[in-house]
Structures are given as C-alpha cells and as structure tokens.
Design a protein with these regions (language model features):
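Surface-exposed repetitive/solenoidal architectures
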Residues: 1-299
Length: 299
C-alpha cells in the first residue's frame, strides 16, 4: 500500500503496479518507487495482472523510478497507448525501466506523453504489434515530449509502421536499437522522426523499407523542422519491395553520420547539410570521426 501524502516533501512511495497506477495518475502528485526496497524488480511473469488492458496514466508532477525495473508485462489494448499523459502541466519521469514488454496496441504508439520529460528511462526487450501508429512516441501540436539519456530497444511486428518512429518528441543523448518495418507509398514520403529533434543520439538495428507502388517512395530520417545534431546512425536499411526507395537525411545543424555500408540495394541515399556518410571501418575510427567534425572522445 502506498505511503506518503503526494507532496514534494512527502511523496507517495509505491512498490506495486496497482499503487503506481493510482499515484502516478494523480494530477500534481509527487511519486517515488520505493527507494529502500530490498529488490527493485517488479516481475509480472505468471502474474494474474497480465494481460494489462488499461493504459498507465502519468499525470503526476514527478515520478522518480529510483532504478526500479518493471518486467514481463503484457499490455493488450488495441485502441490505446501504453503510457499516457493527459495533463498539459509539466511532468518529470526519471530512472524507471521496462524490460520484456509486449504491447498489442496496433492502433496507437507506445507513448503519448505531451509535456512530459523522460530522463534516464529505458524500454528494452519491447515487442510491439503495430499497424496504424507511430512506433514509439507522439506528442501534440502544442506540447512536445522530451527524452534525455533514454534507451529504446524495440521490435515491431506487423504489416509495417506507416507513420514512423516518433512525432513531436525531442531526443537528447538517447540510444535506439530498432527492428521494424516501415511502409511508404510510391510517389510520397514517410518520415521516421517528424517534428522531432535528434541530438547526440545513437541509432542501431534494422529497418525494412517497403514501397507500395512505383513512383519512388521517399524516406526522410527527419523532416527538417528540427534537424539532427551530432547523431550517429548505424542502421541496416533494406528494401523489401520491387520499387526504388530514396533515403533522405535532410540536414543536421552539426555533423551527423550514417553508415553507408548498411544501406541495401534498391535504396538511393542523398546528401544533406552536415551529413557524413561513412564506412563501417570509418565509423569505428575515433580519429577519423573527429577529423570530419563528429566529436568522439576515446576512452
């Protein structure tokens, strides 16, 4: 049972999913996962809690995860996001981690958290069954999400993500490991990060591109509204269709790199401001990367 009154001086202290749901859904509350727990793992494997069919609302002012890991959760709700913030007030979520998360919510993105900042959080081992949404995050036209020092390791399954990875979410110092399909219509463009910034980010994994009709489908990494900055993309891009696909990084405000060895046949890649295409070997050479303006510190 949760303790505390939910104020900044006396936050709610929680250690169960039910108490987390109640406390985090309380507008303006301050919430902490139990900092003194002997174990900080909430393992739902075999639990009667699964499948979870109700989204997890994060409407509190602050949720401090204190390193807690929520594992083996199965979320099944075809018409809702997994984590949602419905408040326009600023919400801070930090150091909370989800492992082995299965989401069957194909009409919605994993997160919908406008006005929320995630710091030091992770979503790993995520299997996402998607068909009609952004893969990861959706802010709003008036309030954007922010992710700092976060990790996203996700596998999307389905006919193809039609909208991209995220919209209206700024990522700084984040790591992505993605395995996903992405579908674009012939003669039109699809955008992986729409109205979203990528600064000091690393993206790895594989994206299987598919063009539905002749007419040169176009895939934009960003749309230029918020260009990349000092980001590194080592993603295996493949073309699973018979039609040519154009890959456009658009532009960056500071040197960003794309590993060209990982771009498959049937994909034509284009230049952009401050974009450097590098070989796999060059991408591992700190001296070379520094020489082209991509800052790397050897350790």
């Amino acid at each position: 049972m949760a303790t505390g009154t939910g104020t900044q001086a006396d936050p709610y202290i929680v250690s169960t999913l039910a108490d987390l749901r109640t406390a985090a859904g309380t507008a303006g509350a301050y919430v902490e996962m139990d900092p003194d727990a002997s174990t900080k793992i909430l393992d739902l494997n075999g639990s009667a809690t699964n499948p979870v069919t109700d989204r997890l609302d994060i409407n509190c002012a602050s949720l401090e995860g204190n390193g807690w890991r929520i594992r083996n959760l199965y979320f099944s709700s075809p018409s809702d996001h997994f984590l949602v913030s419905t408040t326009t007030a600023a919400t801070q979520v930090s150091d909370l981690h989800f492992d082995n998360l299965v989401c069957s919510n194909g009409a919605k993105s994993l997160l919908s958290m406008a006005s929320t900042t995630l710091t030091g959080c992770s979503f790993t081992g995520v299997k996402y069954f998607a068909a009609g949404a952004y893969l990861l995050a959706a802010g709003s036209s008036t309030h954007s999400m922010t992710c700092k020092f976060c990790t996203f390791a996700m596998q999307a399954q389905g006919s193809g993500i039609p909208y991209g990875i995220a919209t209206r979410c700024d990522f700084t110092d984040c790591n992505f490991m993605l395995d996903m399909p992405f579908t674009v219509a012939g003669g039109s463009r699809g955008i992986l990060f729409s109205y979203s910034g990528l600064e000091d980010c690393l993206m790895r994994g594989s994206i299987a591109l598919h063009c539905t009709a002749n007419g040169n489908g176009l895939v934009y990494i960003t749309d230029g509204n918020k260009p990349m900055k000092n980001s590194f993309i080592a993603v295996e891009f493949t073309n699973t269709s018979e039609y040519t696909i154009g890959l456009y990084p658009v532009k960056a405000t500071a040197t960003s790199c794309i590993v060209k060895d990982l771009i498959g046949s049937g994909i034509t890649y284009y230049n952009g401001d401050n974009i450097q295409y590098v070989t796999a070997a060059q991408g591992k050479d700190a001296a070379y990367l520094n020489s082209i303006g991509f800052p790397v510190t050897e350790v």
